């Protein structure tokens, strides 16, 4: 073969090879795997007597217990313990073994309204929460997401009308306070709509008659939470307040001001300030001596601030915060000694353990994330209207179209949040 032809041939061969490589790099497969989903099984290795099983139960060695358990066992306490373990390990399997109810269970139709550009970080977490809740029930369900992209009155009205056209009987709307106000500008609320992210008291521009009877709210009442902490402020204790430099910080600052708390020093804290917080103080600085510190900063900033205050000789007598810091990340960011005088108000109660465990499998936190918690309450409220005898997982009530939470004060002792027995020392 002449040199020129060979050169052209190899050039074409090289081009073909590169094209194939590019196709392989950009190709995506949308075929579902034929493999069945994973199912946990525990293999029995050695015999275990009744006393042996009871010892394993008392020691909470769940995997050893399940591997040794015999289905012919007649001990009721062992039976109950075994069933509880299986419900956590394989909740879907247990649900499939539950006899079908004779009563009619309607298909659940649910619309999710969200402006992705505004609340995108909540979207996946809330969806996982709702899926976890519905998967612990036996009903068929259909969830459809309607993205308004933003919170302008026009976009929200257009998206709401799309939901109405599809005739969904219930809507969960992930909106900010401004989003709710914009929705009410042009839109008539004709379908029961639940907003898990806003508290009704935030809508100060809307009087009671102007709000639709079909609009419900599930947001945390930060004013009530901060009000519970006032009794922890000593008469001669100067109050220092650190607020986040974002919207939530400004909102909490306004609430603190409305409660007539005399603040000696107030400061908005950015992430840059939080990381170099201790540079403003010397070890023997008496700035925090006998003071009460109110932390209206999110968990990461609070962790940075507390860990650096812990290096000072004089520390605040008490550190007070709200739901914003009821987060296990705070326990990891600080030492127990840095938060021994920290008091946090929390509205979330212990709900159905099976639901909590199932949600955690979908990376949804129902113990500490109040938006997830509130969203699940909204779904349950809807299901309860379909069936008055519906077995509820949450104990919160609905008053004047607002979820009423049971706020309690916790301390961050050791590596967990522990409920205080009394509200005062």
Question: What are the language-model segments listed below?
Answer:
Residues 2-12, 26-425:
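Extracytosolic ligand-binding ectodomains
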Residues 13-21:
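Bacterial N-terminal signal peptides
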């Amino acid at each position: 073969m002449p040199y020129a032809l060979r050169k052209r041939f190899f050039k074409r061969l090289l081009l073909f090879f590169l094209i194939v490589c590019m196709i392989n790099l950009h190709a995506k497969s949308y075929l579902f795997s034929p493999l069945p989903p994973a199912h946990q099984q525990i293999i029995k290795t050695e015999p275990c007597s009744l006393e042996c099983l009871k010892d394993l139960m008392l020691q909470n060695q769940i995997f050893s217990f399940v591997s040794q358990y015999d289905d012919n066992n007649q001990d009721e306490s062992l039976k109950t313990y075994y069933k509880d373990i299986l419900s956590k390990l394989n909740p879907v399997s247990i649900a499939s073994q539950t006899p079908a109810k004779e009563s009619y269970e309607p298909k659940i139709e649910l619309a999710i309204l969200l402006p992705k550009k505004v609340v995108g970080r909540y979207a996946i977490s809330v969806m996982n929460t709702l899926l976890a809740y519905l998967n612990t029930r036996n009903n068929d369900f259909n969830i459809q997401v309607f993205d308004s992209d933003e919170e302008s009155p026009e976009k929200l009205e257009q998206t709401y009308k799309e939901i109405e056209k599809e005739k969904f009987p219930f809507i969960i709307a992930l909106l900010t306070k401004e989003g709710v106000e914009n929705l009410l500008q042009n839109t008539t609320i004709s379908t029961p709509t639940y907003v898990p992210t806003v508290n009704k008291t935030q809508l100060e521009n809307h009087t009671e008659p102007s709000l639709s009877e079909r609009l419900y709210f599930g947001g945390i009442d930060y004013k009530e939470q901060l009000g519970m902490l006032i009794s922890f402020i000593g008469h001669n204790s100067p109050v220092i307040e650190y607020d986040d430099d974002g919207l939530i910080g400004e909102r909490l600052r306004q609430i603190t001001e409305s409660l007539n708390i005399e603040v000696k020093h107030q400061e908005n804290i950015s992430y840059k300030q939080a990381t170099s917080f201790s540079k403003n103080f010397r070890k023997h600085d008496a700035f925090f001596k006998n003071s009460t510190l109110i932390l209206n900063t999110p968990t990461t900033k609070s962790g940075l601030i507390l860990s650096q205050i812990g290096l000072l000789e004089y520390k605040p007598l008490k550190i007070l915060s709200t739901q914003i810091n009821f987060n296990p990340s705070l326990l990891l960011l600080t030492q127990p000694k840095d938060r021994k005088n920290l008091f946090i108000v929390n509205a979330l109660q212990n709900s159905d353990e099976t639901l909590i465990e199932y949600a955690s499998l979908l990376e949804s936190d129902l113990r500490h994330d109040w938006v997830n918690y509130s969203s699940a309450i909204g779904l349950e409220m809807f299901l309860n209207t379909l069936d008055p005898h519906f077995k509820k997982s949450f104990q919160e009530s609905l008053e004047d179209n607002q979820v009423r939470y049971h706020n309690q004060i916790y301390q961050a002792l050791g590596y967990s949040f522990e409920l205080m027995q009394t509200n005062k020392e």
